[in-house]
A protein has these predicted regions:
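Bacterial N-terminal signal peptides
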Residues: 5-15
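Eukaryotic helix-grip
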Residues: 20-303
Length: 303
């Protein structure tokens, strides 16, 4: 009987030692049901695209990966993330926005972009053709009319500054309606305050996507153990994005590290028209972009 009791005790102790609360949490909260820390210790990124979006216009991807830096360092990196100039990324300028902005707030960076870059030149041409059906800029009718009416570079610059200032003020005042669609893709995370992020860092960016320019505005904020990033205005490729990273502290080789479960989602009317192979190809492009961002964030945090 005593031998049996010792065996039972040994089994319980062994189970306790082997139990990993972070691994259990990942298995319970994410689609990575067979997860173990060993799967990501060497830098691999786990990917899952199933069961996220209930909206045809939303493309969403989940990833799980390790960053060999403390949770505090990773949180700071994500909240203050500046992708401009990072290898493999398309962002050429990232600027933090004050609580109050005007059309003039954007001109120092926007002017050289529109007149001196390939992507900016594409934006300028699309702006002049904004009332034409061929225009690919994702703007409302009023914004298109404002751009199409411009006759000089200075007028175009001011028009874009006006659009950005109004979009920013609108989000700060009312929130972005597009975020409600994107929430379907992150419903597994839990309740999130997205209409008016508390303590958020607002920013705007200029990007050059192989000669196709993009102008965007967004906000990054911390929500407990999660870091959220949402673009509420994007001119090209998609209309809004919403990303959430959940962070767990772990120890790897005796050093502090961070396990990240990340959901990336983007909204575009174009996604609804994609079927079969086209939809798969679209998802592959999104995944490629996400992996490049993950690698850049990892390199920054691990420095």
């Amino acid at each position: 009987m005593r031998t049996l009791s010792l065996l039972v005790l040994f089994s319980l102790l062994t189970a306790f030692v082997r139990a990993n609360p972070v691994e259990d949490s990942v298995k319970a909260k994410t689609p990575f049901k067979d997860f173990s820390l060993a799967q990501v210790e060497k830098g691999d990124v786990l990917v899952n695209r199933e069961g996220l979006s209930q909206t045809p216009m939303v493309e969403a991807i989940q990833t799980c990966f390790l960053i060999k830096a403390s949770v505090g360092t990773v949180t700071s990196t994500l909240v203050n993330w500046n992708p401009a100039g990072k290898s493999g990324l398309d962002v050429t300028s990232h600027q933090v926005l004050d609580s109050s902005v005007s059309a003039d707030s954007f001109q120092s960076k926007l002017g050289p972009f529109l007149s001196g870059s390939k992507g900016g030149g594409w934006i300028a041409k699309q702006s002049h053709d904004a009332k034409d059906s061929s225009c690919e800029l994702m703007l409302n009718d009023g914004e298109k009319s404002l751009l199409a009416a411009t006759k000089t570079p200075d007028a175009l610059l001011h028009a874009w500054g006006t659009i950005l200032a109004k979009r920013y003020a609108s989000f700060r005042g009312k929130g972005a309606a597009d975020f409600s669609s994107l929430l379907s893709a992150v419903r597994q995370i839990g309740p999130l305050e997205v209409s008016s992020p508390s303590g958020g860092t607002y920013y705007w960016e200029l990007s050059d996507l192989d000669g196709r320019g993009s102008i965007s505005e967004g906000v990054t904020w911390q929500d407990g153990s999660r870091v959220c990033d949402g673009e509420f205005f994007v001119t090209s490729e998609y209309t809004a994005s919403f990303d959430v990273s959940t962070l767990w502290p772990v120890t790897v080789d005796g050093k502090s590290a961070t396990l990240v479960w990340r959901i990336d989602s983007a909204l575009s009317p174009q996604f609804a028209d994609l079927k079969g192979a086209e939809r798969i190809a679209s998802g592959s492009l999104v995944l490629s972009s996400v992996k490049k961002a993950i690698e850049a964030i990892r390199q920054k945090a691990e420095k």
